[in-house]
From Swiss-Prot:
Catalytic reactions of this protein: 4-imidazolone-5-propanoate + H2O = N-formimidoyl-L-glutamate
Record-listed N-formimidoyl-L-glutamate binding positions: 142, 315, 317
Keywords: Cytoplasm, Histidine metabolism, Hydrolase, Iron, Metal-binding, Zinc
Binding site for Zn(2+): 70, 72, 238, 313
Residues reported to bind Fe(3+): 70, 72, 238, 313
Gene Ontology CC terms, in alphabetical order: cytoplasm
Encoding gene per record: hutI
InterPro entries with a match to the protein in the record: Amidohydro_3 (IPR013108), HutI (IPR005920), Metal-dep_hydrolase_composite (IPR011059), Metal_Hydrolase (IPR032466)
Free-text cofactor note: Binds 1 zinc or iron ion per subunit.
Subcellular location: Cytoplasm
Family: Belongs to the metallo-dependent hydrolases superfamily. HutI family.
Originating species: Xanthomonas oryzae pv. oryzae (strain PXO99A)
Cysteines paired by S-S bonds: none
Protein name per Swiss-Prot or TrEMBL: Imidazolonepropionase
Single GO BP term: L-histidine catabolic process to glutamate and formate
């Protein structure tokens, strides 16, 4: 069998085991042809391969490239000053009353042109790529006007053109009510003006909504879902982060790819997600940064068979995090997730949360050849250590990056 590239003398985490584990192969080989894996498994069982190029991995570990399935990467401005104010005793209400909070990010993002937004976002993207990310989702949501939401999504597309990475764009116009606006009037605008325009331009694959008492109601979220489906877009939701608004249950009824945050998720929501195959995207960075105490119902989600994905939730207000490795450690420490769950959460299950499980997140024939090659002794090192980046190489579609 001819192939373009062969990686050998490697230990593999295929994430393709029947038991849902890491699918470890001790002496493994990965072969790639035209950007797709043609073989991944034990070297002893490999077909006769005739590669154009070979890489001796010297017993390093190979996993699927990491996938960050929930980010707000494209924004302008800096809210470190608010962090400092909170440490000195200011409340979120105090900061918001002084013009801070999400309004500050909206103001800065609206004021920035494409070039400024791109310059601000590239370092955040580069930090993620430096830890093995090959695919990430990027949400809009800091424009809150049609032109500014389009600007964010346009910059997300530009990032993918400038770096070797796959970007999955999500429209999050229903992130917050614009300053001085009315929630229902703005929801109507999202549904009748923004979603049709963004769908027509092919700028987003999915629509997200923040369903919470301080954002959009259950009924308004459903209105957004109906509009999204009418325009052929996938559905996602920020749900049950601060209270139980039954948003995850609603999203599951509409076949949502994922429900994210879900600290206050109840049993009815879990059952609905399990029945619909909706992925639970857990965001330990936001939990940590906001000093939350309501842990997502991990054991109940496990018992129901709901897939568990992880993401950084990179954003300026509640999770200024660009490290998937640190997010894994947070998930293990704060949520008591296992090593296998943490690694699967940034590979196999993250691919599922983005509707890409047919080609990303596992090492098996037919999948895209997106790899992360690690200088580690065991998979647990990726989760156990903090402030440690053992990435040896990143591969996208069979090409070293």
């Amino acid at each position: 069998m001819h192939c373009d590239v062969l990686w050998h003398n490697a230990q593999l985490m295929t994430l393709d085991a029947a038991d849902g584990g890491l699918g470890i192969v001790d002496d493994g080989t990965v072969a790639c042809q035209q950007g797709r894996i043609v073989y991944a498994g034990p070297a002893a069982q490999a077909p006769a391969l005739q590669p154009h190029a070979t890489h001796d991995c010297q017993r390093r570990w190979i996993s699927p490239g990491l996938i960050d399935c929930h980010t707000h990467l494209v924004y302008a401005g800096n809210r470190a000053n608010e962090f400092e104010q909170r440490l000195r005793g200011a409340s979120y209400a105090d900061i918001a009353a002084a013009g801070g909070g999400i309004v500050a990010t909206v103001r800065a993002t609206r004021a920035a042109d494409d070039a400024a937004l791109l310059a601000a976002s590239l370092p955040r993207l580069d930090a993620m790529l430096g830890e093995g990310v090959t695919t990430l989702e990027i949400k809009s949501g800091y424009g809150l006007t049609l032109d500014d939401e389009i600007k964010q999504l346009r910059v997300a597309r530009q990032l993918a053109a400038l770096r070797k990475v796959e970007v999955v764009p999500t429209f999050l116009g229903a992130h917050a009510v614009p300053p001085g606006g009315d929630a229902q009037r703005y929801t109507d605008q999202v549904c009748t003006q923004m979603i049709p325009a963004i769908a027509a331009q092919g700028l987003a694959e999915a629509v997200d909504v923040f369903c919470e008492h301080l954002a959009f109601s259950h009924a308004q979220a459903e209105q957004v879902f109906i509009a999204a489906q009418a325009h052929g877009l996938h559905i996602k939701i920020h749900a049950e982060q601060l209270s139980n608004q039954h948003g995850a249950e609603l999203a599951a009824r509409y076949g949502a790819l994922s429900a994210d945050h879900i600290e206050y998720l109840d049993q009815a929501g879990i059952a609905a997600m399990a029945g619909a195959g909706t992925v639970a995207v857990l965001l330990p960075g936001a939990f940590y940064f906001t000093r939350d105490t309501q842990v997502p119902p991990i054991a109940a989600l496990r018992a129901a068979g709901v897939p568990l994905a992880l993401a950084t939730d990179c954003n300026p207000g509640t999770s200024p995090l660009t490290s998937p490795l640190l997010a894994m450690n947070m998930a293990a420490t704060l949520f008591r997730m296992t090593v296998d769950e943490c690694i699967a959460g940034f590979t196999r299950e993250a691919a599922r949360a983005l509707g890409r499980s047919e080609r990303l997140g596992r090492l098996r024939a037919g999948m895209d050849c997106d790899l992360a090659i690690w200088d580690i002794d065991a998979p647990a090192d990726l989760v156990y250590r903090m402030g440690f980046n053992p990435l040896h190489a990143r591969v996208l579609r069979g090409h070293l990056c």
